[in-house]
Amino acid sequence: MSGPNIVHSGYGLRCEKLDKPLNLGWGLDNSAVLHWPGELPTGWLCDALDQIFIAAPQLSAVVLPWSEWCEEPQALTLFGQVQSDIIHRSAFWQLPLWLSSPANRASGEMVFDAEREIYFPQRPPRPQGEVYRRYDPRIRRMLSFRIADPVSDAERFTRWMNDPRVEYFWEQSGSLEVQIAYLERQLTSKHAFPLIGCFDDRPVSNIEIYWAAEDRIGRHYSWQPFDRGLHLLVGEQQWRGAHYVQSWLRGVTHYLLLNEPRTQRTVLEPRTDNQRLFRHLEPAGYRTIKEFDFPHKRSRMVMADRHHFFTEVGL
């Protein structure tokens, strides 16, 4: 499940899967040169690059010398995607390698909502099933997100929503029937849908994804047409550690930026007294924009932008 399993070894990096050190040399501008290690297992290269960029965050790029890699199919596919044999970290992480299926695309038409008096791009259909999957070497877990299912997730979701810690911030406690109805409303919404976050395919969290323009937050800031927003909760106590929260918070931000390349910003509007969450947001790339009032709560608006996320934060 861990793929190449790149680890630190002495003064370099070692691939446990290949059972040998990686032949890495220093390049220009904080890049490294990765020499061809020989015959590779299927899917090794992209997984290895992902783990190299995590293990050596100072690297801006990895060079795969054409003369050495020109007969390696995995490298040729990657060269075609980035149009170079220099794999820049920020560009690599913006490839759709971790999307479980091709993202739905909108028609490009514009829609006017007369009730709210907003003009925005028509949204694509809601995705189905699993949407994202990536092994996180920091915590040695497979992170994935899938669309919530009112049938299979209802009992678990009800338990989460009736947890006093969750209920305090969400104010959404209630019976099984109440929670099924809530999920079904989310699944029929035109601008939002619920995801279940999983570690090693075990459900851990609920994340509501929405288009900011059509959501209530759209009345409180100058939105861009493809801004995405999210509401978050961790349902299982054993997965509330900071390292796990960083994994799925960065992961869901990554998913949103891959899902729609025109999305430049992602936003949250947690309650101002949710201090535990605020401790996790800045390391994941979210900066405070302002505080403001909803009818039911005082909120802090935080925002991550694409350039900062991929160049300064990463995965």
From Swiss-Prot:
Pathway: Siderophore biosynthesis; aerobactin biosynthesis. Pfam families: Acetyltransf_8. One of its GO terms (molecular function) is N6-hydroxylysine O-acetyltransferase activity. One of its GO terms (biological process) is aerobactin biosynthetic process. SMART domains: AlcB. The keyword Iron does not apply. It comes from the Bacteria. The keyword Transcription does not apply. It catalyses: N(6)-hydroxy-L-lysine + acetyl-CoA = N(6)-acetyl-N(6)-hydroxy-L-lysine + CoA. One of its GO terms (cellular component) is plasma membrane. Optimum temperature is 40 degrees Celsius. Its EC number is 2.3.1.102. Optimum pH is 7. Keywords: Cell membrane, Cytoplasm, Membrane, Plasmid, Transferase. Its main location: cytoplasm. InterPro entries: Acyl_CoA_acyltransferase (IPR016181), Acyltransferase_MbtK/IucB-like (IPR019432). It is found in: Cytoplasm; Cell membrane. It is an enzyme of class 2 (transferase). Belongs to the IucB family. Catalyzes the transfer of acetyl from acetyl-CoA to the N-hydroxylysine. Involved in the biosynthesis of the siderophore aerobactin which is a chelator that mediates the high-affinity iron transport systems induced under iron-stressed conditions. This is N(6)-hydroxylysine O-acetyltransferase. It comes from Escherichia coli.
